[in-house]
Amino acid sequence: WIMGHMVNAIYQIDEFVNLGANSIETDVSFDDNANPEYTYHGIPCDCGRSCLKWENYNDFLKGLRSATTPGNSKYQSKLILVVFDLKTGSLYDNQASEAGKKLAKNLLKHYWNNGNNGGGAYIVLSIPDLNHYPLIKGFTDTLKQEGHPELLEKVGYDFSGNDAVGDVAKAYKKAGVSGHVWQSDGITNCLLRGLTRVKEAVANRDSGNGYINKVYYWTVDKRATTRDALDAGVDGVMTNYPDVIADVMNEAAYKNKVRLATYEDSPWVTFKK
């Protein structure tokens, strides 16, 4: 999965997919009442990027729905996965469950079209704080209460705080999650970060009894870093330059080893070599 980083304006969906991304990451900010409000990152952000692009969250969802609904004039068949980077740092811990409920209602209405031929991409809810694990239950309970438990088949989870792998496993246990787990590791492109924890996550994924299904590394903008990440066995790389990642995947060392994921590749099933 080539994951376009910080895609917060509707026009950027096409821009990143046309550069080679089959997945995008979108920031979600919340108001004081835990309503998802804007697709907005803010300052500071990655070097070389504008931090200030935004849409109202519900408007973005409608644009995303158009891009991921077969038959729509705006349909992008390559776009199969969307990571919502949930900026829950602005919320009190006791608002996490409420944020999950409201997120579920927004997605159900504006993205999934109340279960009636809505957007078809897989969704990953990425949460920065392990203490906010109740967001997951708020989300899953709400979809069930609204009569759409089948949509949970399209939803996965990520804790993005670079916490110890064992601590992340405990948070999932508390949240009642087993499966559909992506594990992120990374840092802004302005700084360097080694691959120690990525390798630990990959080992958990491949152990047969770990909690992780897929591992992604962020933010990867350079060819050398891309090669290191692919060599470490990641499933996804998040990038500001999808074309750079696509180029590396076409190099002789990689073109027979890795390929771009398609809709038929489940993002919840651990790939067995």
Curated annotation (Swiss-Prot):
Task: Tell me one GO biological process term.
Answer: killing of cells of another organism
Pfam families attached to this UniProt entry: GDPD_2
Q: For this protein, what is the EC number?
A: 4.6.1.-
Question: How is this protein named in the record?
Answer: Dermonecrotic toxin LhSicTox-alphaIA2avi
Its annotated function is as follows: Dermonecrotic toxins cleave the phosphodiester linkage between the phosphate and headgroup of certain phospholipids (sphingolipid and lysolipid substrates), forming an alcohol (often choline) and a cyclic phosphate. This toxin acts on sphingomyelin (SM). It may also act on ceramide phosphoethanolamine (CPE), lysophosphatidylcholine (LPC) and lysophosphatidylethanolamine (LPE), but not on lysophosphatidylserine (LPS), and lysophosphatidylglycerol (LPG). It acts by transphosphatidylation, releasing exclusively cyclic phosphate products as second products.
SUPFAM superfamilies for the chain:
PLC-like phosphodiesterases (SSF51695)
Sorted alphabetically, the keyword list is: Cytolysis, Dermonecrotic toxin, Disulfide bond, Hemolysis, Lipid degradation, Lipid metabolism, Lyase, Magnesium, Metal-binding, Secreted, Toxin
Q: How is the cofactor bound?
A: Binds 1 Mg(2+) ion per subunit.
Q: GO molecular function: any one?
A: metal ion binding
Compartment(s)? Secreted
Q: List, separated by semicolons, the cofactors it needs.
A: Mg(2+)
Q: What is its main location?
A: secreted
* Active site residues per record: H5, H41
The similarity annotation says: Belongs to the arthropod phospholipase D family. Class II subfamily.
Annotated CDD domains: GDPD_like_SMaseD_PLD
Q: What is the tissue localization of expression for this protein?
A: Expressed by the venom gland.
Positions contributing to Mg(2+) binding: E25, D27, D85
Q: Which GO terms describe its cellular component?
A: extracellular region
Q: According to the lineage, what is the superkingdom?
A: Eukaryota
Supply the source organism for this entry: Loxosceles hirsuta (Recluse spider)
Q: Can you list the disulfide-bonded cysteine pairs?
A: C45-C51, C47-C190
Quickly give the catalysed reaction: an N-(acyl)-sphingosylphosphocholine = an N-(acyl)-sphingosyl-1,3-cyclic phosphate + choline; an N-(acyl)-sphingosylphosphoethanolamine = an N-(acyl)-sphingosyl-1,3-cyclic phosphate + ethanolamine; a 1-acyl-sn-glycero-3-phosphocholine = a 1-acyl-sn-glycero-2,3-cyclic phosphate + choline; a 1-acyl-sn-glycero-3-phosphoethanolamine = a 1-acyl-sn-glycero-2,3-cyclic phosphate + ethanolamine
